[in-house]
Amino acid sequence: MPKKDIHPNWYPDAKVICNGEVVMTTGSTQPEIHVDVWSGNHPFFTGTQKILDTEGRVDRFMRKYGMANPDEDSTKNTKSSKKETSEDSSSKGS
């Protein structure tokens, strides 16, 4: 016999919500479950390719492994050109 008042409430018709729509019902200890991805919009099941980046992890990966956007490369070139200019001016004084 289970002890009383130690188990969570069971909701046999808990709603699973994705993008504001109820996509399915299931049993859970929470009345509503909010998800970003489910089988109806997951790329594996839909046959499409989509990058879902909720916390900037893709950008962090791209920066870490040198696969930055072309816009970011232009800022790197500006920094390196400033170094070249300062080196050129110091060598001219010699």
Swiss-Prot record:
Keywords: Ribonucleoprotein, Ribosomal protein, RNA-binding, rRNA-binding. SUPFAM superfamilies: L28p-like. InterPro entries: Ribosomal_bL28/bL31-like_sf, Ribosomal_bL31, Ribosomal_bL31_A, Ribosomal_bL31_sf. GO terms for molecular function: rRNA binding; structural constituent of ribosome. GO terms for biological process: translation. The keyword Cell membrane does not apply. Residues 73-94 have a biased composition (Basic and acidic residues). Pfam families: Ribosomal_L31. Residues 64-94 are annotated as: Disordered. One of its GO terms (cellular component) is ribonucleoprotein complex. Belongs to the bacterial ribosomal protein bL31 family. Type A subfamily. This is Large ribosomal subunit protein bL31. It comes from Prochlorococcus marinus (strain SARG / CCMP1375 / SS120). The gene is rpmE.
